[in-house]
């Protein structure tokens, strides 16, 4: 960890200044630019376990975990060893490989809704593909998504989206034709009556409904009791498909994802992050009768040059093997509760209004005194105060997501000592806000 007196980011500043002349905003993904929290973005050099080091050799305890995939900790030796062996055989084949079969079997065994799976290269690609599949299966065009839920940056999903769209305060995105989003209906998360009204007003037109079963891209927002069950009932009643976007929650909040955790089985599921072990990956899957429509078995076309590449498959296999060990999710649940409960207590003792919670290795903290059940509630947070909190923690060697509207993540590499150091830093920062 660093101290405020020794915290220097000279090299990060030099590299980021140069990057701004080479890439839009100096980054390859918007949230990395620290626009919503202010201050100098950090340029990383290397990672290991629960820690990251920047190019100025500052060390941080990391609660971003490359936005979720690093559930076993960064650069886990078993994953690295497996990748070295796979790398000796080549980086990509553009043809079937045995690793695809192994990872597919593991995913099918773990996720209740998945009987067949197709691998792609990102969560965005998975959600784009599953949307096409929903429409192909039902022969309907309209879909329902929820305000603040993020399903990647494809045109049809950039309507009241979360993640970077929420972070930057963008209403939607220029360049997206109205015709592209005219069939995208939105409802507030955790509002069953609003969903029912959409179904009633668009009878026999809605192909399906997609959501993050636990919102992570508008901050951490869990489903209210009965919400997921209610969506399952409504979709069945109106002949629509239910899709869980488990790119973030899959293998994160339970080995079988949110659908295992809450006991609600959707028709289709999208995955990413954890199943690639830190390498680019995505997947979508569901019932065989639906997945059989995907080419070459059926007429719905979808393809990818690097889909199912041996490196991503190898990293995913080894990561899931590590997660199968007894006690994995109990440990994540305990260490994360210790962290979030400590943060909430310290903030309130210092006189700050906060709200937050956790499920397994996923957590969130809002700077608001009101309960957060949806995106509108989340937007009431004091983002300026969060920005100051983020900077104070960064200067003390704690790396949090640089946005009030992103969930945080722990890993199996985080120790009680890491959490205690984090809480000590937070106590100091809360006293300065």
Curated annotation (Swiss-Prot):
<comment type="subunit">
    <text>Homodimer.</text>
</comment>
<dbReference type="GO" id="GO:0042286">
    <property type="term" value="F:glutamate-1-semialdehyde 2,1-aminomutase activity"/>
</dbReference>
<dbReference type="GO" id="GO:0030170">
    <property type="term" value="F:pyridoxal phosphate binding"/>
</dbReference>
<dbReference type="GO" id="GO:0008483">
    <property type="term" value="F:transaminase activity"/>
</dbReference>
<dbReference type="InterPro" id="IPR005814">
    <property type="entry name" value="Aminotrans_3"/>
</dbReference>
<dbReference type="InterPro" id="IPR049704">
    <property type="entry name" value="Aminotrans_3_PPA_site"/>
</dbReference>
<dbReference type="InterPro" id="IPR004639">
    <property type="entry name" value="4pyrrol_synth_GluAld_NH2Trfase"/>
</dbReference>
<dbReference type="GO" id="GO:0005737">
    <property type="term" value="C:cytoplasm"/>
</dbReference>
<keyword id="KW-0963">Cytoplasm</keyword>
<keyword id="KW-0663">Pyridoxal phosphate</keyword>
<dbReference type="InterPro" id="IPR015424">
    <property type="entry name" value="PyrdxlP-dep_Trfase"/>
</dbReference>
<dbReference type="GO" id="GO:0015995">
    <property type="term" value="P:chlorophyll biosynthetic process"/>
</dbReference>
<feature type="modified residue" description="N6-(pyridoxal phosphate)lysine">
    <location>
        <position position="273"/>
    </location>
</feature>
<keyword id="KW-0413">Isomerase</keyword>
<keyword id="KW-0149">Chlorophyll biosynthesis</keyword>
<comment type="pathway">
    <text>Porphyrin-containing compound metabolism; protoporphyrin-IX biosynthesis; 5-aminolevulinate from L-glutamyl-tRNA(Glu): step 2/2.</text>
</comment>
<dbReference type="InterPro" id="IPR015421">
    <property type="entry name" value="PyrdxlP-dep_Trfase_major"/>
</dbReference>
<keyword id="KW-0627">Porphyrin biosynthesis</keyword>
<dbReference type="Pfam" id="PF00202">
    <property type="entry name" value="Aminotran_3"/>
</dbReference>
<comment type="similarity">
    <text>Belongs to the class-III pyridoxal-phosphate-dependent aminotransferase family. HemL subfamily.</text>
</comment>
<dbReference type="InterPro" id="IPR015422">
    <property type="entry name" value="PyrdxlP-dep_Trfase_small"/>
</dbReference>
<dbReference type="GO" id="GO:0006782">
    <property type="term" value="P:protoporphyrinogen IX biosynthetic process"/>
</dbReference>
<protein>
    <recommendedName>
        <fullName>Glutamate-1-semialdehyde 2,1-aminomutase</fullName>
        <ecNumber>5.4.3.8</ecNumber>
    </recommendedName>
</protein>
<comment type="pathway">
    <text>Porphyrin-containing compound metabolism; chlorophyll biosynthesis.</text>
</comment>
